[in-house]
Regions:
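Low-complexity, intrinsically disordered or signal/transmembrane-proximal segments
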Residues: 2-5
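Conserved functional hotspots at enzyme active or ligand-binding sites that engage polyanionic ligands
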Residues: 10
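Soluble catalytic domains of membrane acyltransferases
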Residues: 13-192, 198-199, 258, 269-346
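Long, charge-rich alpha-helical interaction segments
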Residues: 201-245
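A general structural signal for well-ordered alpha-helical packing
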Residues: 224, 228, 252, 267-271
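Short, membrane-interfacial amphipathic segments enriched in basic
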Residues: 244-248, 280
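Transmembrane alpha-helical segments and their cytosolic interface motifs
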Residues: 247-266
Length: 346
């Protein structure tokens, strides 16, 4: 079965998604020591928005974009992670579209037409679209060469939509890529207007020169050069800030950190397991986020339900206040534990 047959239109409203997104935004901000948003005024209110961030911290980069506004965001990701039908459906539910590359096979590139149409429909419905134009993540300094996908989607959107289309370059700068509870600055640059009349001008020029076949290539190249010029200073930009007195703070909250550590034991087990399995350590902080804020609370919710059953059947008679504490405290503690623990252990 082809992948597109498994997928639905990602711009359609989904109640479960709408419930989960506020939770993800809250936990993402809790995970970080601080988040600074710079240049939000550069995001137009009445245009189709295509975000173009640098890619350094795997899943967390996407969460950074999702946490920047109130609207759902449609993302693009490499197609090879969609190979299993179950995973493909989950990613589709999360409003993530597959992008095929030449390494996926020349025949598979035609599937990008469906992705591009879906992206344009999402933009027309008012949802921002985000694609990492470097095509892969890298924690090395500097910007990788930009791929053509973002330019092609932007040009198609400008041709098909009756509203302005802009690419907003985004710089994601983490204080320390190896630290889980680090600081993050998200800087939005000046938008790049994608004018559909530019394509007509290039077509005229190409017709006069007798080379109409290069029109799309010229337009794509021109847009990528503009984007690279805008993105490079954003991802190299550093913010100076005053560090908190880490030693004093650590001493003050150390007793609470010990309790928090107990509630993080399931998460520690998961991260330790995957740390030994993965070769690309750039994924480690993303795994920590999933373990601490998605899987760990579910485990403690199950434990709370088991405790509720035990208390309800009177296996261990306890005062009412102790029973309520035993049942309702684990999940909130599991949610608060990462910020407390990683505030001491960095």
């Amino acid at each position: 079965m082809q992948l597109v047959q498994l997928m639905k239109l990602v711009y359609e409203n989904n109640r479960v998604y709408n419930i989960l997104v506020p939770y993800v935004r809250w936990t993402f901000r809790r995970m970080l020591q601080r988040v600074n948003y710079v240049g939000l005024e550069n995001i137009p209110k009445d245009a189709a928005i295509i975000y173009s961030p640098n890619h350094v911290n795997t899943l967390l980069d996407a969460l950074a974009i999702l946490s920047s506004g109130k609207s759902p965001v449609v993302f693009a990701a490499r197609a090879d992670i969609f190979r299993k039908p179950t995973i493909a459906r989950i990613l589709n539910f999360l409003k993530i579209l597959p992008i095929y590359r030449i390494r996926d096979g020349a025949d598979s590139l035609v599937e990008n037409d469906w992705t591009f149409r879906n992206a344009v429909l999402s933009l027309n419905a008012g949802l921002p679209f985000c694609i990492f134009p470097e095509g892969r993540h890298s924690q090395e300094p500097g910007l990788l060469p930009l791929r053509k996908g973002i330019a092609r989607i932007a040009i198609k959107a400008a041709e098909d939509l009756d509203k302005p289309v802009v690419i907003v370059p985004v710089g994601l700068v983490y204080d320390d890529l190896k630290t889980f509870r680090t600081g993050l600055t998200i800087r939005f640059g000046q938008p790049i207007a994608v004018d559909d009349t530019e394509g007509l001008e290039l077509a005229d020029m190409a017709e006069e020169s007798g080379k109409p076949a290069v029109t799309g290539q010229k337009r794509t190249r021109r847009l990528l050069l503009k984007l690279e010029e805008k993105m490079r200073p954003l991802q190299e930009w550093k913010q100076s800030h005053t560090r908190h007195p880490v030693i004093l703070r650590s001493i003050l909250i150390a007793p609470f950190a010990l309790i928090a550590g107990l509630f993080l034991l399931p998460a520690f087990g998961l991260t330790t397991f995957f740390d030994k399995k993965i070769s690309d350590k750039a994924f480690l902080n993303s795994i920590r986020y999933v373990a601490c804020y998605l899987i760990n609370p579910i485990i403690w919710l199950i434990i709370s339900l088991l405790l509720l059953i035990i208390v309800a059947f009177g296996v261990f008679p306890l005062p009412l206040w102790a029973s309520l504490l035993l049942i309702f405290a684990p999940v909130p503690m599991a949610l608060l534990a990462p910020a407390i623990w990683y505030g001491v252990v960095r």
